[in-house]
């Protein structure tokens, strides 16, 4: 019999690149994954977070202690192709996952993680891990789950130390759509679920660097036929589709690596008068195309409670964020205006091209999960299109 004071044998490990070993209880997929560790401060929306393609190459530490209480369902998914498993490769929880209790629950988080191939662990001090990230930055690590508790610790340490990290890594090519498609699903409505678009009134081409479903839903809900194209689609092919607007999506990895093929395309598109709107990685792509620079952040911004100031209105919005790279505002050339800034650290959160229908934001106005303070940006984009077509403007805020 095991003595009451004996330490429980761990069935999961988080091994950091500096050799630190954190022991926990495993759940989700068995095996291991090497990635960068970040933390997310959102209280809700764990399915949307873990399926957001922007988290590719990352292990998400949830600062809220109770994750999984409402189970999982087939609707709260953000990646376009769940079979491709675009999104986080690992997850770290404080409390053990309990049986779900929610009218929408269709399954247990543990089983859902297994199906998604996400390696997870629970039962650790997530506050201490978050403090470590805040102090030292986002570490490279290996997360491993073995139900029998048998690990090759030397191998795990070697893999964690050897991984080069996200700098220079183009992950958009790993999570983008394989072929063009048309999106017609509209936002979720209480007691009705998601809708189906009827007759679209305008055409938006969305370049998919790892786009989230809710972005596409909001565009469709405003009357846009949304054609989603792979990240490496050329400008001639895009322009041949005769879009009324161009959307540059969110996505994972180093923007400068993705920019090798994405920036020339965006620069060609900017030679036209077609309105352009970018979010997250798309924001960074636009900044690079305009001559700016990006840089890796110390701890990144991941959560649903970030204050951002809109310089154009003077208002403060609470927004969702998910990025580990940021645009260097000092690198922006003349004619590019900084429109939004983070009130946490002063980093750039938005730009606009003076006198042109071109703008982007670093944060996620579609939320999912998170507040809807910035939903008006989708209406602003559609209004730029409608203005160009001589059509009546939508109310920007409803």
Curated annotation (Swiss-Prot):
Ranges for region CPSase: 1-199
Reactions listed under catalytic activity: hydrogencarbonate + L-glutamine + 2 ATP + H2O = carbamoyl phosphate + L-glutamate + 2 ADP + phosphate + 2 H(+)
Domain Glutamine amidotransferase type-1: 203-391
Residues noted as binding L-glutamine in the record, renumbered to the chain: 54, 251, 253, 281, 284, 322, 324-325
GO molecular function ontology, one term from the record: carbamoyl-phosphate synthase (glutamine-hydrolyzing) activity
Nucleotide-binding among keywords: yes
The enzyme's E.C. designation: 6.3.5.5
Pathway field: Amino-acid biosynthesis; L-arginine biosynthesis; carbamoyl phosphate from bicarbonate: step 1/1; Pyrimidine metabolism; UMP biosynthesis via de novo pathway; (S)-dihydroorotate from bicarbonate: step 1/3
Superkingdom of origin organism: Bacteria
GO terms of biological process kind: 'de novo' pyrimidine nucleobase biosynthetic process; 'de novo' UMP biosynthetic process; glutamine metabolic process; L-arginine biosynthetic process
Enzyme class: ligase
SMART domains reported in the protein's UniProt record: CPSase_sm_chain
PROSITE patterns the UniProt entry points to: GATASE_TYPE_1
Residues at the catalytic site: 280 (nucleophile), 364, 366
Keyword list, A-Z: Amino-acid biosynthesis, Arginine biosynthesis, ATP-binding, Glutamine amidotransferase, Ligase, Nucleotide-binding, Pyrimidine biosynthesis
Family (UniProt): Belongs to the CarA family.
Subunit structure: Composed of two chains; the small (or glutamine) chain promotes the hydrolysis of glutamine to ammonia, which is used by the large (or ammonia) chain to synthesize carbamoyl phosphate. Tetramer of heterodimers (alpha,beta)4.
The protein's role, per its UniProt record: Small subunit of the glutamine-dependent carbamoyl phosphate synthetase (CPSase). CPSase catalyzes the formation of carbamoyl phosphate from the ammonia moiety of glutamine, carbonate, and phosphate donated by ATP, constituting the first step of 2 biosynthetic pathways, one leading to arginine and/or urea and the other to pyrimidine nucleotides. The small subunit (glutamine amidotransferase) binds and cleaves glutamine to supply the large subunit with the substrate ammonia.
This protein's name: Carbamoyl phosphate synthase small chain
Biological source species: Mesorhizobium japonicum (strain LMG 29417 / CECT 9101 / MAFF 303099)
